[in-house]
Amino acid sequence: SDVDYSTNSSGWYEVTNVSQLQCIGANGPQQNYVLTNDIDATGTQKWNDDGSGAEGFDPIGNFSAPFTGSFDGQGHEISNLYIDREEASYVGVFGAVEDGRIENVGVENVSITGKTSVGGLVGEIDGGTVSESYATGLIDISTNQRAEYVGGLVGQNYGGTVTGSHAKSSVTLSGSKSIYVGGLVGRNINNGTVTNSYATSTVTGTSRVGGLVGMNNDAAINTSYATGTVTGGFAGGLVGQQRNGATVDESYATGDVTGKFPGD
């Protein structure tokens, strides 16, 4: 990358601005990074404009080159980040995280559009960890194609861990083919775990819509809760649909739930 980084005494790359955040993928998605201060990413609203509108920030890590390192936010916040990639998969500040770790970071007032595996912080975790982190803002997916796995914090948790984290997002997934939307996690699957986490999100979707998790499949939710408003088919205050021995322990929901069937 053409962006320079300093390293701290532990050899971690220091991220001090939004350009350094954007260039993590080019600098090395297998490296370790630390956020040294809050970042206002308002400028991303004008990034990557091809004449038909700005696509904004390019998610860190994708399916072919996922983020595999560690990112420690040190309790700092990234605010006003903008992503408009309505045909894309693996969309979030981090698009795809494989066996990597994202911790101690807040994403405030994010604005994201995408199609599949979309989250306020991470699009998809594959065996990795998101801990002590949160996201707030707007995730709005509208497509005539099939869109799935959309969450306020994490789109899909595939065998990974989400712990001590929360989301307060407006998550809207419209379109007749759209499924799996959750206030915190869209789909929790393959022994994924969600622990000590909560969502106060407003969640709207077509099918398999949950205040915390849209679909909990062969996975676990522990000591977590949701208080948001949920609207959709297969709608649940905590979980939209449970399958294949998925478990929920010491968790609850108190939000308003409106179930509706496609076509209503």
Language-model regions: role of each:
Residues 1-264:
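Surface-exposed repetitive/solenoidal architectures
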